[in-house]
Amino acid sequence: MQPPSLLLLLLLLLLLCVSVVRPRGLLCGSFPEPCANGGTCLSLSLGQGTCQCAPGFLGETCQFPDPCQNAQLCQNGGSCQALLPAPLGLPSSPSPLTPSFLCTCLPGFTGERCQAKLEDPCPPSFCSKRGRCHIQASGRPQCSCMPGWTGEQCQLRDFCSANPCVNGGVCLATYPQIQCHCPPGFEGHACERDVNECFQDPGPCPKGTSCHNTLGSFQCLCPVGQEGPRCELRAGPCPPRGCSNGGTCQLMPEKDSTFHLCLCPPGFIGPDCEVNPDNCVSHQCQNGGTCQDGLDTYTCLCPETWTGWDCSEDVDECETQGPPHCRNGGTCQNSAGSFHCVCVSGWGGTSCEENLDDCIAATCAPGSTCIDRVGSFSCLCPPGRTGLLCHLEDMCLSQPCHGDAQCSTNPLTGSTLCLCQPGYSGPTCHQDLDECLMAQQGPSPCEHGGSCLNTPGSFNCLCPPGYTGSRCEADHNECLSQPCHPGSTCLDLLATFHCLCPPGLEGQLCEVETNECASAPCLNHADCHDLLNGFQCICLPGFSGTRCEEDIDECRSSPCANGGQCQDQPGAFHCKCLPGFEGPRCQTEVDECLSDPCPVGASCLDLPGAFFCLCPSGFTGQLCEVPLCAPNLCQPKQICKDQKDKANCLCPDGSPGCAPPEDNCTCHHGHCQRSSCVCDVGWTGPECEAELGGCISAPCAHGGTCYPQPSGYNCTCPTGYTGPTCSEEMTACHSGPCLNGGSCNPSPGGYYCTCPPSHTGPQCQTSTDYCVSAPCFNGGTCVNRPGTFSCLCAMGFQGPRCEGKLRPSCADSPCRNRATCQDSPQGPRCLCPTGYTGGSCQTLMDLCAQKPCPRNSHCLQTGPSFHCLCLQGWTGPLCNLPLSSCQKAALSQGIDVSSLCHNGGLCVDSGPSYFCHCPPGFQGSLCQDHVNPCESRPCQNGATCMAQPSGYLCQCAPGYDGQNCSKELDACQSQPCHNHGTCTPKPGGFHCACPPGFVGLRCEGDVDECLDQPCHPTGTAACHSLANAFYCQCLPGHTGQWCEVEIDPCHSQPCFHGGTCEATAGSPLGFICHCPKGFEGPTCSHRAPSCGFHHCHHGGLCLPSPKPGFPPRCACLSGYGGPDCLTPPAPKGCGPPSPCLYNGSCSETTGLGGPGFRCSCPHSSPGPRCQKPGAKGCEGRSGDGACDAGCSGPGGNWDGGDCSLGVPDPWKGCPSHSRCWLLFRDGQCHPQCDSEECLFDGYDCETPPACTPAYDQYCHDHFHNGHCEKGCNTAECGWDGGDCRPEDGDPEWGPSLALLVVLSPPALDQQLFALARVLSLTLRVGLWVRKDRDGRDMVYPYPGARAEEKLGGTRDPTYQERAAPQTQPLGKETDSLSAGFVVVMGVDLSRCGPDHPASRCPWDPGLLLRFLAAMAAVGALEPLLPGPLLAVHPHAGTAPPANQLPWPVLCSPVAGVILLALGALLVLQLIRRRRREHGALWLPPGFTRRPRTQSAPHRRRPPLGEDSIGLKALKPKAEVDEDGVVMCSGPEEGEEVGQAEETGPPSTCQLWSLSGGCGALPQAAMLTPPQESEMEAPDLDTRGPDGVTPLMSAVCCGEVQSGTFQGAWLGCPEPWEPLLDGGACPQAHTVGTGETPLHLAARFSRPTAARRLLEAGANPNQPDRAGRTPLHAAVAADAREVCQLLLRSRQTAVDARTEDGTTPLMLAARLAVEDLVEELIAAQADVGARDKWGKTALHWAAAVNNARAARSLLQAGADKDAQDNREQTPLFLAAREGAVEVAQLLLGLGAARELRDQAGLAPADVAHQRNHWDLLTLLEGAGPPEARHKATPGREAGPFPRARTVSVSVPPHGGGALPRCRTLSAGAGPRGGGACLQARTWSVDLAARGGGAYSHCRSLSGVGAGGGPTPRGRRFSAGMRGPRPNPAIMRGRYGVAAGRGGRVSTDDWPCDWVALGACGSASNIPIPPPCLTPSPERGSPQLDCGPPALQEMPINQGGEGKK
């Protein structure tokens, strides 16, 4: 090669390298300019740039015009969006080379340009046929786009859907381009280029090493002695000097410390940290910034015009401080790196500093002068010329216009133009304009109804009263004349005013001082003295107080002497003296001897208040009137002798005796004479016991003075003593020192007073000052009153304590400077006088600031006015008159002298100046202003002044008259007195005489009658003042006008239910009710607690306490708690709150009762709920029948057995050191606890497989139905409820368990058999509900709750309806029906015990009880059961129980009697032979059982697939598990599915009454219950059981076809037709499942009915209770014809979702329904829809190995790598479930193998865990696997769920269906398995669709005799879901041989009917399930598939079947 050629080649290579390394993007400053169409290039980092396009252009280089520039492009308010062409290299359809546009239309419009009005918000083309449209809540349509499309109307390609980014790049959709976020090591638009790290500067490897580039990374080739990714490790120990620059040396232990590493500080690198790298190598300094290297960083030194860390921020020069950049008003505009000035007109230059000469280009006319101005010019015209350019002739020289008009020249035509003065018109403005005449054709110029008066050049308005102004536009301010009295506020009103008077003044003008004494405020005849704004009361003696209302108690000072009693009187007192005293104060003693009361000869002795006669000898008595020896005083023969003032009767011998026997009376101070006492002097009384005069014996002690009384005496005690005889020492309280109602309390040193709240002080003499605490707010003044206080509020506040803000008004006088106030809704408004402003007119205006004076003067303000100081040469008020004569002034203005002054004014020379003498009505320096005659305010007393042409007119306020309203009229004329007061005129006003009850100047005030306290104090609650009256509100127990009458509160009989009423004064109601037994409450209206101290609400059960002395308790239902069952149910499971105490961790479990929990506890808290042992207070609560969770533990015998079903120690016999109670049922095996004594560790050590999912629901539905289901007769399936027990081996009385459960009757009906099955599965023994001799379930109400119940009653669906009514309604507290039931269950223990060592289960009932007690103790039993289990009683079955149940809750005698009767019934029942023919049929309420006339074989249908749709096509009890494909179906809550029994070949369609014969179908009588009247038309929508209508029954029974329903409907074709024609409702739905007739037509595959229902308006999108639409039901039932009908309906929502989010497409993919997946995709079903677990239809197809559906979904755009909520892909599910075909399909399309789920598992990992070796080989890339399956050794060879072929010798254990089995080796079968659902071949080729036993009683069709072809030429595959035939052994005309021994009995396989009525049988051909027989080799069931002659293909052991 020649050297020039070599040189040329090198040059080409260099150019190529430069082009390769050149960065992508634009380079600003290159040639040519990169930005087109005026775009600006902006530099970015790394030298790249971007174009900022000018308006109207777009694109990367602004190369495209913006189509949205046209504002009319999108019509009707649509928004326009420009769409750029797709970039090159993207996977998109061919796009145009010019941009397009997209119009986003408003709701209601559509079209490419939104030009069409849209009736339907979602037209078919709205989403561009690439998505589905649905309407949002706001009414706007919204599109759900298909994969690969995006945008509001799915019009944009989603370029990221194809994942264009390679090498792990993440695609970011930025339309119309994409952006790939590349991982480290890759770059490029699609991350397609590998970054060569070795070319970087500096390189990644240190000096002295070699760099080798790798894909996405690099590798450093280290010399000897260095190692590490970057050769950073050096051999040898750390050098003594260490590492440079502060680095840390660290030995590498993983290299045996033979290498060391320097850890460098920031800013240094290198093996020894010796290098400071240049950080400026890759700096990002922009815009000319200089990089300055630093330590581990760099700094950008920016030029002056840029700032920021990378000099990328522009400095805004326009905002910098300093002198402005732009002068002369120029505007500064910032730009990138600079600025520029936008100058105003006339200026130029960089900073607008140059003044441009505008006269250079001016065009002024010749002869004119141009004058330059700023930004303009002006032309100075010569005389006679005018115009802007002086180009027009001045037409005004001849003065053609009126003198007051303005003349100008028209700039266009050059003619004269007159601008008229106001009020004139015409060409020359000489014509007067009649404004009032114009008002007749339009609005009047005078407002508010003013009258218009035309004047020359103007008009005047005659205003109505109250208005003023030139146009009556202003409200006249009547307050301008200041009519109100000084100190008051004038309120301006419309045509009047109102004076707001201050306190103390009144009257219309506030001119009258208020007489506060007019209302007679002073009491007790006091004199009132009027004050200003107040009064003073001059009290009479004896009264005090502000109003003399307090009567002074003159008796306080004890003014009465000598024991006189003081009586207080108003203003005085009165002394009631004792006898013997007199005087005003009883101070004078009366001398009773002055009147000589004693007879002559007797001496009078004066005594205090009495006298005493000293009788002479021989006389006695008070007045000495009785002789001592009176006649007949002595007896005969006795002699009367007077001895010492005493008469003695002496016997003849001189001795006193000889008294007769009858004189034996007792005389104290006298002698007995003739049986009566003759008293001594001074004594009296029957026995002379009373001292006459009293004082003779000196009874008064301590020197007291005695005063005799008629009945005794009275002692006047000296100071310090008191009492009747002065014997008591007087205390300090005796004198009553406490005043004002205070109570006196003696004390050792004297006394102390307890004062009432109204007074205080040592003697309660001072009124309490309530104002001390300042209770008034907002500046209010506190006024103290007796016992209370009041607040006088400041201005603007109100309320009892002035706490409320008062809306301001003119009453607050807010206006200042004599302004006028006007009230308005917004508050007061002040009308300010001239010169003032502000809200309150408080601010003096600066009048000179408005420049009222011209430039030739100075303004000087004085107060609210101003005047002008004229400069030399000017004069006038405004200095606008030149200082010249009239002649000169007119000449200077070019007018006549007569026109100098306006309005006819006369110009008068005055010295050097002149002035205008104005005519009347005008003013001003030139007479230019009209004079306002009202300006001087001539009208008085609030009158309104109205200007008139000739003066003014005053409109007077009411009460005034005269020219200026100065004359006052009669003040009473306006009737100012209110409330019928009498008005009397007086000078200056009036006087109102008020009637009683009213006060005030105008009698406007109502007297508060309650001030005098008229109500009775003890019976009054409150006094209410009324208008001139009052009302007393009485306390309970009082009545009357003044509440003075007491009433009997018991008179109205307030006590209910026979309660006794007792009146009490202290109770709140005034009475107390003594209630009878059973009632309580204040009025005995509440029923007493029925359970001890509590009511059992919400169906709770009352249980007696087994512990003596403890009250009964409530056992609550449905999760309620608390002593009364009122506590709402707490969250089940783990809460919150967590049920585990002391930081225990909680895990949830499942069961019938909802989620349960299991606690994992720390060692210090080992209880079931992590409670600590030995809790306080547990001893007292142990054994009380209530489980206390805190006391439950082995230490306290599980709360004395309360928490363990009454068993104190369930683990009795288990070694205590093993702590097995703590390990029981914790999910882990503990060998030390795996024994019978330790209850088998709760079966944790063995986990046999659960019941096959396909059989679990079937076994649930057929549990204990009287038929042996061999596939269900396993421990994991519940032993079939004991149906398979041997007939002959049962004892007469078998083992049993009696359970006490708390369930409501409806719940018991629904959950009874579920309860038995759950316990059977839990205990692993056979359990069933026993029946009595009449075949009824042995279920009895709990005797303790309803003792009156008879044991004959059993479980009854109408239990609640038949309950006996209450004899007395109890309102809301009526207890619900009994929730407690005793359920007796039989137990099959034949497979347990020592005889069966392989079976580990409890072998006696006692062990069962211990096992259940242990589960209850650890909390594992409650969540498994539907309700609480309170007690269990086992019975071994050897003899009937003789005693009552030995548990605490059944301890009453009634319970014992009942249980004895229960035992007798059990014995009689078990003696009889058990019937095996059929199970008991329970019919729902409303159905009646038709009596059987003849026996018939029983038929039922076995399960046919794991989806179990055929078992019960109703709402599933359990939703589809997220990880499985099993969709268990069953009855709805509250729904039972019965089995209709077949009675031979059916001839009728049995409905509600199950009676034969359709009758006359058009009348629809057979479809409705009995009508009330035969004449009434039948109700076509009558509801039957579960809400079933006749239309539903007709759809269920089906359409008439050949071979189907022989004799159905008695020849009546299509039974729904007459119903729909008669108006039957097609939208009705059942109560339980919510299914409509269209649902039933889909479920039973009735295409004719479905079509007819759609025509009748049935809603195809109506969901049932599970959210399923008819399309869901049709897909699930494989009703293809119905599916096609629904898909053809435009109303059908193909993407409707159930409650779990399942769409019909997901259901079809999951159930492998043939062809429906493709049909749904063709109907635009969303292939990317997700359910609530995040799974798509492709996930479900992969999970069930539906390769056909998966292929169709992938072809429709399904995402092959979609991840669900657990981040599992379809490939992951295929690997987990062993779906080889789907996995091959996905791997062939490049599905990601390494995507992991949340647990970090990849598809290969889960395939390895599940032993799917064939899939593992696929995933590891070894190619497609062969048909093989490696069996792993183990117990029974382990499960093989995916064998491809079936061996005849290998049956599934238990029969049933084996989901997805592919290979079964000989002798190795899955336990609990069944028929293979995914096998590619089957033994018998039956009809695929529309026939078989699974098509709901329809006939089989299309089955070729002898195994001929099926309809449509298809061969039925077991992999198909939906209705599929069984491998049945057929006979009859189909030539099918018997299966078991050559014959199949029709009695063996009774038909299982659906819930909605009994349909006719498909035919008389029995369809048995797989024949299951025991295997003699392995003891497991075998699959007997009939003779091989009928098989279409041989089944080879270990190989594929060939067709």
From Swiss-Prot:
It is a single-pass type I membrane protein. It comes from the Eukaryota. GO terms for cellular component: cell surface; cytosol; endoplasmic reticulum membrane; extracellular region; Golgi membrane; nucleoplasm; nucleus; plasma membrane. ANK repeats lie at residues 1633-1665, 1666-1698, 1700-1732, 1733-1765, 1766-1798. Glycans are attached at N664, N714, N964, N1143. SUPFAM superfamilies: Ankyrin repeat (SSF48403), EGF/Laminin (SSF57196), Growth factor receptor domain (SSF57184), Notch domain (SSF90193). Residues 1347-1371, 1485-1508, 1900-1927, 1968-2003 are annotated as: Disordered. CDD domains: EGF_CA, JMTM_Notch4. Residues 1489-1502 have a biased composition (Basic residues). LNR repeats lie at residues 1170-1213, 1214-1250, 1251-1294. Synthesized in the endoplasmic reticulum as an inactive form which is proteolytically cleaved by a furin-like convertase in the trans-Golgi network before it reaches the plasma membrane to yield an active, ligand-accessible form. Cleavage results in a C-terminal fragment N(TM) and a N-terminal fragment N(EC). Following ligand binding, it is cleaved by TNF-alpha converting enzyme (TACE) to yield a membrane-associated intermediate fragment called notch extracellular truncation (NEXT). One of its GO terms (molecular function) is DNA-binding transcription activator activity, RNA polymerase II-specific. Residues 1469-2003 are cytoplasmic. Keywords: Activator, ANK repeat, Cell membrane, Developmental protein, Differentiation, Disulfide bond, EGF-like domain, Glycoprotein, Host-virus interaction, Membrane, Notch signaling pathway, Nucleus, Phosphoprotein, Receptor, Repeat, Signal, Transcription, Transcription regulation, Transmembrane, Transmembrane helix. GO terms for biological process: branching involved in blood vessel morphogenesis; cell differentiation; cell fate determination; endothelial cell morphogenesis; epithelial to mesenchymal transition; hemopoiesis; luteolysis; mammary gland development. It is found in: Cell membrane. Belongs to the NOTCH family. Functions as a receptor for membrane-bound ligands Jagged1, Jagged2 and Delta1 to regulate cell-fate determination. Upon ligand activation through the released notch intracellular domain (NICD) it forms a transcriptional activator complex with RBPJ/RBPSUH and activates genes of the enhancer of split locus. Affects the implementation of differentiation, proliferation and apoptotic programs. May regulate branching morphogenesis in the developing vascular system. Heterodimer of a C-terminal fragment N(TM) and a N-terminal fragment N(EC) which are probably linked by disulfide bonds. Interacts with MAML1, MAML2 and MAML3 which act as transcriptional coactivators for NOTCH4. This is Neurogenic locus notch homolog protein 4. The lineage of its organism: Eukaryota, Metazoa, Chordata, Craniata, Vertebrata. The gene is NOTCH4.
